[in-house]
Amino acid sequence: MSDLYEKTYNPDVLSCLANLSNDEVFTPPEIVNQMLDMLPESIWNDPEATFLDPACKSGVFLREIAKRLDKGLEPIIPDREERIEHIFKEQLYGIAITELTSLLSRRSVYCSKYPNCKYSIVEFDSAEGNIQFHRCEHTWINDRCKYCGASKSEYDRDTSLETYAYEFIHINDPKDVLPMKFDVIVGNPPYQLSDGGGTGSSAKPIYQHFVDQAKKLNPRYLAMIIPSRWFSGGKGLDKFRSEMLSDDRLSRLVDFENFRDVFPGVDLAGGACYFLWDRNHHG
């Protein structure tokens, strides 16, 4: 499978994508692999392990996971066609953040934006495959979204425009989005929304909601890359900071002082970090 991806993308198009904005940032493949390296090697030999990216933008996390599973499961499922079918249909799942990124993710993962056609690596019954996108709306209470805190004046939009109401965090119980258990949840969630006062340091962070929702699913492992500004709290991050620092399941934290060291061309103050949360770690 890795050789197929290399033939399809040479050079790797996912290392060349322009970011959607400073808030929705594509993850370079090398950073994705650094994050996946934090997981135990045994996970790649487990045909029962399930993986979820709850904030698919380019599909790079699922694609790199697929490469590792293809290699790791070879002794267990020697027939490659059967192995690939199993990996894509039974192990890899994604929730896209927009309709556009759902198509891009499917193109990256399945080599076809419509995985129910003959050009897909694996042919599904549906046009979504295992990477879904369902348009959501904000739930307004006193001019703020009850889930993400978005400003009604900024995001109460015409139906033809993007709502930025991300499915994974606009619901009380994330099990209602995908009613199944996941061993690994991994991704790079959207970072912030304009709160009516500007962007950058004055924008409202939302990445913490993705982390909190992922924890509700109680995976074996959770790995995400997010801005480091939560280290100092403020801007609605005090509770998140306190919970992260007191959570003994946080087994690893890698920090980059300069955001551009991870995401070239992206200007966000405070740096970036990625972490591994291990359900069975108590340190």
Give each language-model segment a name.
Residues 2-262, 271, 278-283:
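SAM-dependent methyltransferase catalytic region
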